[in-house]
């Protein structure tokens, strides 16, 4: 590469791929939701549901602490299995936008909701908050299909430094492959 493209800044990485890894890649590609656990989501008492005949969604906000815990207790390959792009990291040369997300979270967490576009997640199902606990949404399975940069940046902040930020999120249930 260096002799044919001397001006190009190209880095080549190699990984050993065996049957287990190939099978894992196949499973991730054939099912967009690869994280099958169930989670309780603190919604701070806010949210609403939208339904059509083909899908339903619950729109709410999650705390940065909840998102931080989700990222750090799951496998990114599974968490982002339905997303064509994984978390890209942050730094001056890597990704200035993610660096900006991190700085906003640290400097002005209470305004983060206004700065951030939010997250879209596919789930197998959810149970809306009821009168016994208006602050909890129960979800089954999850893959983040939009918001990997926000999720990864929040997850990369050191424990105890996440702050009181809230992040917009949509939890969508849809089995129609022409829509998802």
Task: Annotate each PLM feature.
Residues 13-17, 122, 172-174:
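Conserved beta-strand termini and adjacent loop/short-helix elements that scaffold enzyme active sites
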Residues 97, 115, 178-179:
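Alpha-helical structural motif
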Residues 17-24, 127-128, 176-178:
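A short acidic, often aromatic-flanked loop/helix-cap motif at beta-alpha or helix-coil junctions
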């Amino acid at each position: 590469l260096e002799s044919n493209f001397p001006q190009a800044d190209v880095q080549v990485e190699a990984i050993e791929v065996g049957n287990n890894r190939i099978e894992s890649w196949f499973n991730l590609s054939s099912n967009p939701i690869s994280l099958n656990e169930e989670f309780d989501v603190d919604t701070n008492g806010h949210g609403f549901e939208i339904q059509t005949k083909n899908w339903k969604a619950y729109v709410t906000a999650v705390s940065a602490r909840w998102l931080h815990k989700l990222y750090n207790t799951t496998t990114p390959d599974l968490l982002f299995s339905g997303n064509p792009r994984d978390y890209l990291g942050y730094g001056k040369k890597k990704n200035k936008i993610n660096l900006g997300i991190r700085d906003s979270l640290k400097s002005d967490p209470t305004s983060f909701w206004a700065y951030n576009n939010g997250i879209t997640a596919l789930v197998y199902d959810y149970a809306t908050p009821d009168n016994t606990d208006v602050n909890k949404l129960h979800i089954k399975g999850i893959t983040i299909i939009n918001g990997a940069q926000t999720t990864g940046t929040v997850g990369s902040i050191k424990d105890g430094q996440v702050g009181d930020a809230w992040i917009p999120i949509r939890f969508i249930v849809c089995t129609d492959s022409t829509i998802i």
